[in-house]
Amino acid sequence: MTERTPVEATNIDGYGSPEFPWKDVRDQLAAPVGVEKAAYLGTVRPDGRPHSAGIGPVWFDGDFYITGSLNSRKIKNLMANPNATLSIRLPGFDVTLEGTVSQVDDPDTLTQVAALYRQDGWPAEVAGDALTAPYSAQTAGPPPWHLFRFRFSKVIALRLSESGGAMRWRFDS
């Protein structure tokens, strides 16, 4: 996989603010998440009720990657329905991504994503087809934590500067 480019860009601002390029948002999305950026994964329970979980995603090769225990609510939801949203507050932007999530067990991807997590401060290591570390989020449960790719098909970004603006980009799945 490689970085993806939008197949459609639409200015959805209702106040006449100018368009802004995908690159501005993409560069912020690809930066290490860290603690100063809040990210939330939205899923749907099998009975239709919504679920939201704070997560620590990393950007790799044009997609986001997340981890989770197979026993966690978010992963159980994704196994039943892979559609999800990812909402992130970035410096200068509020961004919501819509897409699908799939489990990753490719050793090369696991190794590369674990290295990105280590660069971001979480000491993740590959253990079989999942990741492990001395610690994780308080609600993560015990290791191992499996890796999942969030492949987005739509991105909506609100620019938070004085000039404002709102854009929607669509991507091939």
Description of each model-found segment:
Residues I12-A39:
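Short, basic/aromatic recognition patches
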Residues K37-A38, N83, W122, V155:
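Generic structural signal for secondary-structure transition and capping sites
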Residues M79-A84, A115, Q119:
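Short, intrinsically disordered, mixed-charge
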Residues E36-L70, K76-L78, A84-R89, T96-T100:
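Short beta-strand segments
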Residues L70-N71, S161:
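Secondary-structure transition/turn motif
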Residues S72-R73, D108:
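A generic structural signal for alpha-helix starts
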Residues A30-A31, G56, K76, Q138-A140:
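Short secondary-structure boundary/capping segments
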Residues M1-P21, F93-S173:
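Charged, gly/pro-rich active-site loop segments
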